[in-house]
Amino acid sequence: ISYNTFHTTAICSPTRAALLTGRNHQRVGNGTIAERAVDWDGYTGVIPKSSATMAEVLRHYGYRTAAFGKWHNTPANQTTAMGPFDRWPTGHGFDYFYGFLAGETSQWEPRLVENTTAVEPPHDEKYHLSEDMAVRGIDWLRKHRSFAPDKPFFMYWAPGAAHGPHQVGKEWSGKYKGKFDAGWDAYRERVFAR
């Protein structure tokens, strides 16, 4: 799939809606983030059924589809355990979803959903959502290859680690300890001096 006029916006829900549908974010009801949805044209936070997502189109053509990670394309008042579920990933063409519905979540104790069911992350001090998603994504691909090796697949991968809260394990943060203590300006000067 290749887009010829795609652009990002400064906020995530609109960009995700455009990426998923191949259409302008306001034309698909996502002129702002899902939590700020209002009853104005282009700002409802609802991707209309008349605007199919890539997953819906590809599933129609025989693909198996899965989404992992951050969704953030459902109005907040519709993300409870009671649904409605038609605006969750499985209602937008994904056969499988594992991730979180909101704009951000803890990377160590995330509020996770598998398809339409809330699930608890493992209670393990070494747990991190990015690693969990990678393991589950690889597992999904292995199952797909085992059960339907000739069937095409589409995996939507949307990690949440770039969003707050910024939580990284010590094995990663330790590599940068002391490198930025002089401040942004000093670092910038060193970079531009190279």
Predicted regions located by residue number:
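Formylglycine-dependent sulfatase
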Residues: 1-194
